[in-house]
From Swiss-Prot:
Family statement: Belongs to the UPF0359 family.
Location relative to the cell: Membrane
Residue ranges with Basic and acidic residues bias: 411-422
Transmembrane segments: 81-101, 114-134, 152-172, 181-201, 225-245, 263-283, 291-311
Superkingdom as given in the UniProt entry: Eukaryota
Single GO MF descriptor: G protein-coupled receptor activity
Extent of the signal sequence: none
Keyword tags: Glycoprotein, Membrane, Transmembrane, Transmembrane helix
Sequence segments annotated as region (Disordered): 409-458
Membrane topology note: Multi-pass membrane protein
GO terms (BP aspect): G protein-coupled receptor signaling pathway
Native source species: Caenorhabditis elegans
Residues listed as glycosylation sites in the UniProt record: 21, 45, 323-324
Protein name (record): Transmembrane protein adipocyte-associated 1 homolog
Length: 458
């Protein structure tokens, strides 16, 4: 998202233009009544081209940038329609401020803090820019320079927020402390600062262009639009490539967001940047139709981008209650105590059963099947007559894989055969054995086994 219109003093940079149609068309060389010859040649049989309706649409897209509110106010329509939604969203953020602060204090997520800061800062800077622009007469050179500077600042903040959102979204699993967040932020600044520097050079006319040929790279005429077309097209390709990442083999390098909201966010940014690039290209070739593409995409960008960030990355996270035990199930590669390096993944076990709702679900996973049998004569399941009179393992274990030290065999053929054999055996007179704990090498220790108790103490 770069300049809006290089001859529009209220939205970007350029010479001051009076609020009249004739002056605007003469200075900008964009006519709302006729289309360029290349459009007539491209669409020779389209009656909508240069029709009265088409001229009205072109005129509206042009007037909204420069016309001011009636009643003697110096406020432009463009500033007003951007300011009002941002103020409403800021009021919404203020109402949510208490819950946001509590969530940030109880949680330990630097990414959440970074996203929250991006939303609040972007909204405040946009409101300050709109409010200050309303007080400018735009006829004084100093005030015009201040307005230009504010537009560059707000676009710098928004571009930085874009790259931060992409970085945090794609590297969420790797950003677990403030240092990693700072490194990611510095990486985004390496892209946004050069982009803004080129904008400053073009819009402030810092470089003397007398030595440049009169081509599309002429800074005073079309250089800004060419840069706009190129930057918007590159951003659209970046977002489109990110949308295609789940289709390529890159899962081992980055943890891609699985939420559909992130893909919707990328899709919206692709559409906005494509519209920006198309609009700038049309204006570059002297077609006033580009003003409509530019106006719609720019308005959506400066009004809806902070809310999009909030509802995509923050809303669900801020609504969830703090969970102090979530750190127990966070994956973190263990370090060897002797300092020899990382331990292999198969060294430490993973107990998927720990996430079950109750303790019995882990250790007594097939209770009904073990203590009942099917009676053919009665055509129903009845309690086993040898209930609590036979010895049975508390849980089936397996060390066949390094994936876990405890592996249930629910539903397997071996377990079904073992269960049926136990149910068919007569009672041996043994009583229920109570589990005391785990002994060496994962063996089960029972209360009535003295040798096992001795090994447990060891």
């Amino acid at each position: 998202m770069s300049v809006i219109f290089h001859e529009n003093p209220g939205t970007s940079l350029g010479s001051v233009v009076p609020d009249t149609n004739t002056s605007f068309e003469r200075e900008s060389q964009l006519s709302v009544k006729t289309s360029p010859e290349w459009i007539d040649e491209l669409f020779p049989n389209v009656s909508f081209i240069d029709s009265p309706t088409h001229q009205v649409i072109r005129g509206f897209c042009r007037d909204v940038f420069v016309y001011r509110l009636p009643g003697g106010f110096r406020v432009r329509y463009w500033d007003a329609v951007i300011l009002v939604p941002n103020i409403l969203f800021l009021l919404f953020l203020i109402l949510k401020c208490g819950s946001v602060i509590r969530k940030l204090r109880t949680g330990n997520s630097p990414v959440l803090r970074a996203f929250t800061l991006l939303v609040y800062v972007s909204t405040l800077v946009n409101i300050i820019r709109c409010a200050y622009s309303m007080t400018l007469s735009m006829t004084d050179g100093l005030e015009q320079t201040v307005d230009q500077t504010l537009w560059i600042i707000i676009k710098f903040f928004y571009l930085t927020a874009e790259f931060c959102a992409l970085t945090f979204g794609l590297l969420f699993g790797h950003l677990d402390n403030g240092k990693s967040i700072l490194i990611a932020l510095l990486g985004t600044l390496l892209v946004s600062i050069p982009h803004t520097a080129v904008q400053v050079i073009i819009e402030m006319k810092i470089i003397d262009n007398s030595w440049l040929p009169l081509t599309y790279f002429d800074i005073q005429s079309d250089g800004g639009f060419l840069f706009w077309v190129f930057s918007s097209a590159v951003l659209a390709l970046v977002y489109f490539f990110i949308m295609c990442l789940p289709l390529v083999c890159c899962q081992k390098y980055t943890k891609l967001p699985s939420k559909g909201s992130f893909l919707i966010y990328c899709m919206m940014m692709v559409v906005l940047n494509v519209l920006q690039s198309m609009g700038a290209a049309l204006i570059l070739f002297k077609s006033s139709d580009g003003l409509c593409f530019v106006g719609v995409s720019t308005y959506v960008y400066f009004v809806l981008y902070p809310p999009i960030i909030y509802f995509t990355f923050l809303r669900k996270k801020l609504k969830t209650p703090p969970n102090n035990t979530s750190g127990l199930f966070m994956y973190r590669k263990h370090k060897d105590e002797q300092g020899s390096g990382d331990l292999p993944d198969s060294y430490y076990p993973r107990f998927s059963g720990l996430t079950s709702p109750s303790y019995d679900d882990l250790f007594d996973y097939d209770r009904d099947a073990r203590f009942t049998h099917y009676d053919i004569s009665r055509n129903e399941y009845v309690q086993n007559p040898h209930y609590n009179t036979y010895s049975t393992p508390l849980i089936m274990t397996s060390v066949e894989t390094a994936e876990s030290t405890v592996t249930t065999r629910t539903g397997s053929d071996d377990y079904a055969h073992h269960r049926d054999s136990m149910l068919s055996e007569p009672s041996t007179g043994t009583t229920t054995r109570h589990l005391k704990g785990l002994g060496p090498q994962g063996s089960l220790v029972f209360e009535d086994d003295p040798s096992s108790l001795t090994s447990l103490r060891m």
